[in-house]
Curated annotation (Swiss-Prot):
GO terms for biological process: mitochondria-nucleus signaling pathway; negative regulation of transcription by RNA polymerase II; regulation of nitrogen utilization; regulation of pseudohyphal growth. Keywords: Nucleus, Phosphoprotein, Repressor, Transcription, Transcription regulation. It is found in: Nucleus. Residues 95-167, 209-279, 291-320, 343-366, 381-432, 551-584 are annotated as: Disordered. The keyword Hydrolase does not apply. This is Negative regulator of RAS-cAMP pathway. Residues 114-127, 229-254, 267-278, 343-363, 398-432 have a biased composition (Polar residues). Residues 381-392, 557-568 have a biased composition (Low complexity). It comes from Saccharomyces cerevisiae (strain ATCC 204508 / S288c). Transmembrane segments: none annotated. The modification Phosphothreonine is found at residue 25. InterPro entries: AreA_GATA (IPR013860), Ras-cAMP_regulatory (IPR053043).
Amino acid sequence: MSREAFDVPNIGTNKFLKVTPNLFTPERLNLFDDVELYLTLIKASKCVEQGERLHNISWRILNKAVLKEHNINRSKKRDGVKNIYYVLNPNNKQPIKPKQAAVKQPPLQKANLPPTTAKQNVLTRPMTSPAIAQGAHDRSLDNPNSTNNDVKNDVAPNRQFSKSTTSGLFSNFADKYQKMKNVNHVANKEEPQTIITGFDTSTVITKKPLQSRRSRSPFQHIGDMNMNCIDNETSKSTSPTLENMGSRKSSFPQKESLFGRPRSYKNDQNGQLSLSKTSSRKGKNKIFFSSEDEDSDWDSVSNDSEFYADEDDEEYDDYNEEEADQYYRRQWDKLLFAKNQQNLDSTKSSVSSANTINSNTSHDPVRKSLLSGLFLSEANSNSNNHNTAHSEYASKHVSPTPQSSHSNIGPQPQQNPPSANGIKQQKPSLKTSNVTALASLSPPQPSNNERLSMDIQKDFKTDNESNHLYESNAPLTAQTILPTALSTHMFLPNNIHQQRMAIATGSNTRHRFSRRQSMDIPSKNRNTGFLKTRMEISEEEKMVRTISRLDNTSIANSNGNGNDDTSNQRTEALGRKTSNGGRI
């Protein structure tokens, strides 16, 4: 740092040096790009005010240039001016120059304008209705207070700006800062194009007439034509339904929708009811709101609501709903009556019950519903099932009688009177002939059961018998649930099933050979507890063959010597088996 950069009023041991503000003038700002300035601050840190902070800041700026930018000669003006200025002038308590105060006065004068001059540029439109004019006169008494409050709120931030003081070493930075501050914080409010000074809540907001304003909305030109067409269609559609209900109800209450036009029910000269629409648009106060563009197609209150409301009212009218409810109620009563009539007539005869239901349904001249005939079909199916079941039951319980090959011999079969259920039963009578034989009531029919072998039939019989062999100590619920589960979704293991079959039939199980087991195929019999080698398995198979052969020979030989020989051979084979087990 050069000598002129320091202000040395008194040189002494108890005095400290101070960095002069002239360092921040535009002529000397280029010194912040030089490394010599920062090195001088580092060396003179012990005898300069805020020397430690200047020392640290200087080192930080140099290290940033070397390590981050990899160039110590890079421009360090921004970091140096910003950091060193805030160290030397931390509080900003210097007074503002007169030039800066003069710069700040124009926005304050602009903000202090009276509210009347600020409101002169706003376009206002008077109200034509006397009720709205009266509401405007009543509300105008409260407006001065509200407008004064708004002006005070707008001027308050500007006064705060005037009270805040900033100190700078050069005026151009402070002027630019203050101008930017005023631009950022002064809110330019956009006033609406149309202001209504008073508004009465009791007035009805409607659309402005078509001839009084200019618009390009397609609904305005076509709306009246559509309304006339809709009136004609509704008068045609509702006339037949009203004729049906004219004898029951003479008058209907007048209903009015929220947006649609009210309508009243009137009697014509012929005594028929008809719908008539009454227009209630006359005598209402009208307020027209437009957007910022006078030629815009959109209005805040549109006539489309009336157009669609009329359609909704005509489509979903209460009268039509009542008629539909009564129609479906009559249909439901007919179905219930048909079901009850079917139950009553079934005691007499099935044919007569079907005829009565057909006659009851044929008398109705009104259109049929989708549910018509539901109970009729169910009743017919139930009666047919009942007839077939009863005939099968009667045929099973009739005692078998002898039949003859000659049908013309003997008395004719007698017919019994009809039973309580209206079904005629025919019992076969005795027929006398030369040749008599007992036969089944139904002729034999070829079936697939003949193809089954006798072995399969025997197995089926043993399976049915084995189901009732077990005895359980379980409670009654388990005794009833377990057989059902076994017959539906539970299956017994094969070995247990085979054991029960063997016990039931008493067959010899010694001739049954188990599957070959080895080291590769683990044994399913877990009673042994160890695995066998192939040699042991082959020896056991040989032993089983010899035992079976000896048993067969023992049956053939009935003398005592033969029995002794076979017993000796069997003991020798068993001795070899036990010796092999002892080795393992």
